[in-house]
Amino acid sequence: MPSTAEKQRRILPFFQFTSLSTKDKFGILVQRDPRLAGLGVLGRGVLFSCFHEEHLKEATQLYEVLIECESFEEFLDLCHQAREYVNEGLYVYAVSVAILHRQDCRGVSLPPVQEVFPDKFVPSETLFKAFKEVRLHPDDEEIIVDIEKTGNVKDPEYNLAYYREDIGVNAHHWHWHLVYPATWRPEVVHRIKDRKGELFFYMHQQMCARYDSERLSNGMAPMVPFHNFHEPMEGYSSHLSSGINGMPYAFRPHGRILKDMREVSVQDLERSRERLLDAINLGYVVDPNGLETPLDELHGIDILGAIVESSNDSVNKSYYGSLHNWGHVIMSAVDDPDGRYQLNPGVMSDTATSLRDPIFYRWHRFIDDMFQEYKKSLTPYSSQLQFKGVIVKSVCVRAKTADVVETTFANALLDISHAFNFGRTGPVKVRYNHLTHEPFTYKIVVDNAGTKTRKATVRIFLGPEHDNLGNEFDIGRLRRLMIELDKFTTVLEPGENVIERDSIDSSVTIREQYTYRQLQDGRSNREQTEYCSCGWPNDLLVPKGNEHGMKFRLFVMLTDAVQGQVGDHGATGLCTDAVSYCGAKDQLYPDRYPMGFPFDRDIKADSIPEWLHPNMHFSEVTITHHQ
């Protein structure tokens, strides 16, 4: 049995120079395995989309075959064979899903997708500049080029480009859809994805809440949800070009409307929306046999999430359709819906690029509005909010200045040498800016009025205090803007307890991702690797704020951890980070409460003090941005 380090070394070449032939890289090509029959339908050079039903069908066939390989050597052989003729993007997607879910790949890390496909993250002008620089420098010299801007102030939405086009944010979205494939079939791979539909709802809801906080940080109004399938859309140009076919991602001029495609029509999407809203209002969904499944408090959001995406867990895909996925596809094809011009689709077609487009957030707020219709049907929390005998006395944030968190932009380097064969030994890198924040620590003083120790779950959220016009958000509007910062368990001794927690330890984020070169050097060869590397980038844990100091409400709540505990999460040492958005490997989601609790349901209170219980606390935090 090869070591983890050896497995890592042997897997990495599958992710290098993905558009090139690999016959001379892996040795003698064995005869094509019959299990790969039927693959290769999606041609090489075509942009793969894991939102497209036909693309997903072929990708699923490949990753299921790879997961079921009995040995690691057999797995490598099939990866080797498939790479010769399977579509480049589909291949990387399927192999990545397999690596994340094979038991004998535990401890093996995926190389960053931004190094595998930098053309999905870096403007084509920048890549062109890199290719020019290569000719001007010795082969062993490191080359660094600065990333080019993709717009200017003529477009107000460009103020948010730093966020929408952030490399870490887009990589997170790509990785999340690897961990939770829409076509996952537990009966085939013998593993259940617990609360997968609810995670789909919650992760994307949090993306929308975070995006609105960034808009407010820049003096912009919260986004207007997509709501009319026949309304002209705003324009967007990504300045990206595909490295596998040389053509740019289609841009969308201002004023375009959705058009019917061969695969799906606008009317199909409208019909799906109406049927989903009918189900929510009736309180149940109908399976193909006419049997009714109630959308109850315990499972309703999970059932609904599976239908909306739609995943293989949908109770009736033929009736309810695939609103979310086909929406992405049809929005990416507004300029060439029938393929007559043979254009690339727009960035909305790809999980690694779709967050760049402003319409992504409006589309997902539209999707979230349907989930919220369901949440409105549930009884607002009352006794569930209480944790009797536990009182949160004070909360503060310790940083350079108390209750003030500073943000700024920092430089980082992206190595593109493993995607493009520059014919040189020295690395070629792109320098880019990204938002970051100073490290900070929560200090929470809690009183346990009982005589025994108690196990508590600490839930921390953050939301903007005012809208772009200076009006204070009431609790009803604020709840949908609250972003989760952390969730962890602690033990409360009788009497006063001081809880301290560093921002770097957030349950939402990942600390670091190893580069391709670091993986080559054996930096990440540990059996107990972090499965949930789909976590949010820690640099973007908090919103940008502004130079004057933007006021936010920091919310801390303690709940009974024993009451909320599910399974034995953490016992394996796997996936102890980033569980809020990504769940836990081969385990139940480690929190019995609904995701987003207590802000996932309507709040029936006229003011924040009226809603609060002793185990809950709001305080004011200022986020100041320095250029």
Curated annotation (Swiss-Prot):
Claim: Glycoprotein is one of the keywords in the record: yes
Keywords on record: Copper, Disulfide bond, Glycoprotein, Metal-binding, Oxygen transport, Secreted, Transport
InterPro entries noted in UniProt: Di-copper_centre_dom_sf, Hemocyanin/hexamerin, Hemocyanin/hexamerin_mid_dom, Hemocyanin_C, Hemocyanin_C_sf, Hemocyanin_N, Hemocyanin_N_sf, Ig_E-set
Location, primary (coarse class): secreted
UniProt binding sites for Cu cation 1: H173, H177, H204
Disulfide bridges in this chain: C534-C582
Subcellular location: Secreted, Extracellular space
Tissue specificity field: Hemolymph.
Single GO molecular function: oxidoreductase activity
List of glycosylated residues: N312, N316
A Pfam family the protein falls into: Hemocyanin_C
Residues bound to Cu cation 2: H324, H328, H364
GO cellular component term of the entry, any: extracellular region
Other remarks in the entry: The two copper ions bound each have 3 nitrogen ligands (presumably contributed by His residues) and share a bridging ligand (possibly contributed by a Tyr residue) in addition to binding oxygen.
Subunit structure: Tarantula hemocyanin is a 24-chain polymer with seven different chains identified.
PANTHER family tied to this protein: FAT-BODY PROTEIN 1-RELATED, LARVAL STORAGE PROTEIN/PHENOLOXIDASE
Job description of the protein: Hemocyanins are copper-containing oxygen carriers occurring freely dissolved in the hemolymph of many mollusks and arthropods.
Membership in a protein family: Belongs to the tyrosinase family. Hemocyanin subfamily.
Name of the featured protein: Hemocyanin B chain
